[in-house]
Amino acid sequence: MIPRIMSTQHPDNYSIPFFANSPVLGGEDEITEAFYAFNVLGADEQMWDFEGKEVDEFVVKKLLERYPSFFRKVILGKDVRLTPRVPNPTVEKAEAKLLLETLQGITRAADYARVFYGEDIAPIFEVILPMTTSLAEIERVHELYRKVVNLADERIYDTTVKEWIGEFYPKEIGIIPLFETKVALLKSAKIIGEYLERREPEYQRVFLARSDPAMNYGLISAVTYVKNALQEIWELEEETSIPIYPIVGVGGPPFRGGMRPDNVDNVLSEYPSVQTYTVQSSFKFDYPTKEVVKAVEKVKSTKRKEPYSLEVPDFITLYEVEYQRQVKILAPHIRRLATRIPDRRKRKLHIGLFGYSRNVGGLSLPRAIKFTASLYSIGVPPELLGLNALTDRQLDVVSEYYVNIYEDLEFAMRFFSFRVAEKAGLKELVERIKEFKPEIEEEYVAEAEIVFRGEGDIIKLAQMRGFLG
């Protein structure tokens, strides 16, 4: 069974998990978290994030040693999955060799599983390749893993590697490309189609980002590009008769996908053709456990349906330009606030996509969660940026395929400070939002205005809206 729920390590929570030794999760706590996601919450997959994070490479060994009774009943690699996100050497040169180490670690994890289960079971048999933009990047990882496995046949002095060190298993792995940029999302189906022609796998998984596209191009553009990709992937699946299972990376705020325990129905209706939905840290730890379990069960009880059909509207480009103009205006405030947003995971040095993006003049900004948290904390939710570039008629066109757009905008408008937006230089946005006559959470906005001035309680605001960023 292909997973419906992928637990991830995205640090968007304001609450500290009950099992954590520190507010900043890492190492041993993340081993516990993986078990908690499987055993208590009912997730059927855990992403293990080697891309820019300090994670434990002995995760399989530790899970099997610490929780043997659970993993004898629930087989790791069959009933539940552990899926690493690896660095992409094309983009992340400093972390490039970690890709090779992670691929070698897959075979080591299989050795631990063989000892534990008494048979060949691959606890890890797929990897997620972030920032994928071409067929070549996917093929390189595929070929590199093959070389790792073929090392077994090499002669070392007076013996072979296989005789000395043992077999390398599994023989093949699946590569899950993660498409994050506008260009990559728009050509994702084409890239996957080329890959399927060469490989003809039993099935293929595809990961579509929601947070970074929203940060780079705005909420409405991100939803548009992801939905366009989902439609083309569905058509490719019908054309090739090879099952293609999309994963969508969704976080708590509408800006990052709206995946909260109290909003799963909307997410399911918004992305009906998606097979696997991410549940990030806020989903897992900022809500009562009963609500979280119920929400996970709800998703797992449903099946994929046909996606919405759409053509990317021409006016989206104008919206993007205005969104990026407003981000530039807010950049000093975002950077100032980001230093006050608490860290929730141990991270290595990492440059987000915005750092590489030429269309914003190389503007250096924090990653999506702190970006979102910073803007919510001053009462300017990022969902609303660029909205003044669209007419009511254009929003109606978008609502034909982005079915929850008005609900998402209404959610964000509750936390909007007209005063802060005006002071920051977003007069046109202020005038446009007034037309919606939003119901404002006055207590929230009052605190956000204090935060904008340099004081105030950022965690209190996160609790009021239901997520950190």
UniProtKB/Swiss-Prot annotation:
GO biological process, one term: oxaloacetate metabolic process
Keywords: Carbon dioxide fixation, Lyase, Magnesium
Enzyme Commission code: 4.1.1.31
Cofactor: Mg(2+)
Broad class of enzyme this protein falls into: lyase
Pfam families membership: PEPcase_2
Catalytic activity: oxaloacetate + phosphate = phosphoenolpyruvate + hydrogencarbonate
GO molecular function: magnesium ion binding; phosphoenolpyruvate carboxylase activity
Keyword Cytoplasm recorded: no
HAMAP family for the chain: PEPcase_type2
Family from the record: Belongs to the PEPCase type 2 family.
Subunit structure and binding partners: Homotetramer.
Purpose of the protein: Catalyzes the irreversible beta-carboxylation of phosphoenolpyruvate (PEP) to form oxaloacetate (OAA), a four-carbon dicarboxylic acid source for the tricarboxylic acid cycle.
Annotated protein name in UniProt: Phosphoenolpyruvate carboxylase
Organism: Pyrococcus abyssi (strain GE5 / Orsay)
Gene of this entry: ppcA
